[in-house]
Each structure stands twice: as C-alpha cells, then as structure tokens.
Design a protein with these regions (language model features):
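Histidine-centered catalytic micro-motifs
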Residues: 44-51, 224, 242-245
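Alpha-helix-loop-beta-strand connector modules within alpha/beta enzyme cores
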Residues: 197-213, 232-242
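Bacterial N-terminal signal peptides
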Residues: 11-21
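Substrate-binding cleft of carbohydrate-active enzyme catalytic domains
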Residues: 207-221, 227-228, 261-267, 342
Length: 363
C-alpha cells in the first residue's frame, strides 16, 4: 500500500483503527469524516495477507465473520466493515527439506494454494476480483468488489521447475519473495540459525529475480538477509519492496531493516510496508520453558495448520493460562505505531505502507 502524502498516511491510521480495540485510539468526528472521504477516493490495500492458508481450512468460511477467533483474521464481512479494499493474497509454502521429492511437493503445494485463490474469485465474482494492474484494482473498487492481487511468500515452489514461474505470472502473480524462515535454493534467510549459505542470493536466485522482474513481478525482500537486500538493490533495474517488515532501530531483530538500508530503499524508489507480527515489534522475553510449553500446547491440537476453528477459543484460553505461568511481553498498537512513525520519519510517507501479516501471525 503506497502512501503518497502525510494526509494519506493519516487516513491509513484512521482506517487501521477499525481493527484495534475500542479503547486503543480515539478520533474526532471531523477526523473520521476526513478519513472516510479520503478512503473512498483511494484503493486501500494490505500488502501481505496470509488468508489463502485459511481458505484451506474446511471449517472456515471466508464469507462469514469470525471476529475474536485467532485462526481467522480476514474475512469478507470484516474487510467491508474495516474499509479494506483488498490486498496481496500470499501463496505461502513453508520451508522444509530440500530433497528433490520435497521440492516437487512444494511445487504442488504452491499450485494448490494458487488454485484456492482462483476458486474463491470464480465462486464469488460479486465479492472478489483478481487484479494485475493498478487500473484493474481501481475498477474493482469502483464496482464495490474486494481486490485480490496475488503474491508469493517463499519461492520454494519454483525450485523443482523455475519455468513454472510463467504459469504463476499468467495466473496473476505480481509480487514474490525469494525465501522464508530458512535458507533455500535461491537465497539466505534473515532468520536461519545456521547462518548464511549463499552470502545473499544463490546463482539460481539471481537468475530467478531477473526472470521475475522481466514481465513485471515485483520482488519482495521481506524474510531475506541483509546481503540479499544489498544484492537486490545492485541487480534490480526497478524498485523492490518489503511487504511486511519493521524498523531495526526500534527493535533490533534480523527480520527488520536498519535505517541505512531504509534510505537506500527509498533512493531506489522502493517501499516498506510495516507489519504487525508481535515477534518483530518487541522482544517478548519468552523463556525456554514458555516456548516449550507453547509448542506442546499447539502440538496437542495438531499444529497451527490443523487446529479446528471450534477449538480456537479453548486454545486462546489455554494460551492466557500460559501467560499467567510464564509471563511475556506482548506487542501493542503503540509498538506498531513506533515502527510506523520511525520509518515515516526516516524515508517519508511516499515510501511507507502497511502489510499487517494477518492470518500469518500478525495483529
């Protein structure tokens, strides 16, 4: 979501307030009216929605509101209520083993998630529509429909056969990151505890970036290492983005970006979308015992991907019990605001947007 003026930046905050607790922020009637009028003229997008993962849950209906349920943060009723016109819906594949068989599984998983997105769009043409250009997005909003841009988080589905990228582009892919939590065949991750494998992009990664940028796919540096950022800037004839990242000056985490690179990003014409993933906003101070207890709890429900929507309330209550036994610091809207205000001060609103990481741990 590209902000081009401070008034637009303000409008985003006002619109964002709809998703925050009622006590969190207060605005005057005039401010809200100004924000509403501005939003009606703008296409308001979130640059990183992990909602396609939710589409694969048999017990979740994205057409129904699931307010208060941690397993579903984005649905059609709340998009309408919160004035979110749409966003980039992520084809996400978790980084696992890197065997030939695993890469084939990743290829199939990615294509299946892409199919889920298209199935939703085809089944609900009055509510969702695919966008591939800003002009399309504007027309979709004018029709009262939600915008579905397609992004890819982790390029692992392309390792087995990089030419599949052409299929993704033809089916709407317009934003792509090279890597996720762990190093892969294309790039080093910012968070792999083993450290750098390629010292940035691998030879295959450099080739993939060039192949993606040629038809117009924007490269997303989020989750990649600092060395990957530096190489993307050097290699890319067009701007890159960080679809869901934070400010390292506010919280020193490798997933966040330092001020020097923020300024380079801006000079290169790029944009950072500030994310709301608590672990990247503040240090929770979780003890090893807390981490082990939380893992055991999630495993009891079969892992995050297999938790039933009906069990989410019980899971939330159990996590609160863990908070009492093993206190941690939880990120707040003030912490998010600190990151947002910092990057605005460093590079200006024309280089700042919002990528909340909803349905992927954000919020």
């Amino acid at each position: 979501m590209h902000l081009r003026s401070r008034s637009r930046s303000l409008s985003v905050w006002l619109l964002l307030a709809a998703a925050l607790p009622a006590h969190a922020l207060e605005f005057s009637k005039a401010e809200l009216e100004r924000a509403t009028a501005l939003q009606q003229r703008l296409v308001t997008l979130d640059s990183h929605l992990d909602t396609p993962a939710t589409l694969e849950r048999a017990d979740v209906d994205v057409l129904q509101a699931h307010a208060g349920n941690r397993l579903s943060q984005v649905d059609y009723p709340r998009m309408v209520e919160g004035a979110l016109d749409g966003g980039f819906w992520a084809v996400y594949t978790g980084q696992g083993h890197r065997s030939a068989a695993a890469h084939l599984d990743d290829r199939d998983t990615g294509l299946q998630r892409l199919l889920k997105i298209h199935t939703l769009v085809v089944a609900q043409p009055q509510r969702f529509a695919l966008a591939t250009t800003p002009a399309y997005a504007a027309r979709i909003k004018a029709a009262g429909t939600r915008v579905v841009y397609i992004g890819m988080k982790n390029a692992s589905p392309l390792v087995a056969d990089p030419t599949v990228l052409r299929v993704y582009y033809a089916q709407g892919l317009r934003l792509m990151s090279t890597v996720h939590f762990l190093n892969n065949a294309f790039a080093d991750s910012a968070t792999d505890t083993k450290g750098a494998e390629w010292k940035g992009l691998s030879p295959a990664g450099k080739q993939l970036v060039q192949q993606a940028q040629a038809p117009g796919i924007v490269i997303d540096r989020s989750h990649a290492s600092d060395a990957v950022f530096d190489q993307l800037i050097a290699l890319s004839p067009v701007p890159i983005v960080l679809s869901h990242s934070g400010a390292r000056a506010v919280y020193n985490h490798p997933r966040n970006i330092d001020d020097a690179r923020l300024k380079v990003l801006a000079v290169h014409g790029g944009v950072i979308q500030v994310n709301s993933y608590g672990g990247y906003l503040v240090d929770s101070g979780a003890s090893p015992e807390r981490k082990a207890a939380e893992k055991a709890l999630i495993d009891h429900y079969g892992g995050w991907e297999h938790v039933k929507i009906a069990d989410a309330t019980k899971l939330s209550a159990a996590l609160k019990e863990l908070d009492a036994r093993y206190p941690i610091k939880r990120a707040t809207e003030e912490n998010f605001c600190a990151h947002l205000e910092h990057v605005l001060a460093v590079v200006g609103p024309q280089h700042v947007g919002i990528g909340m990481d909803r349905d992927g741990g954000g919020g």
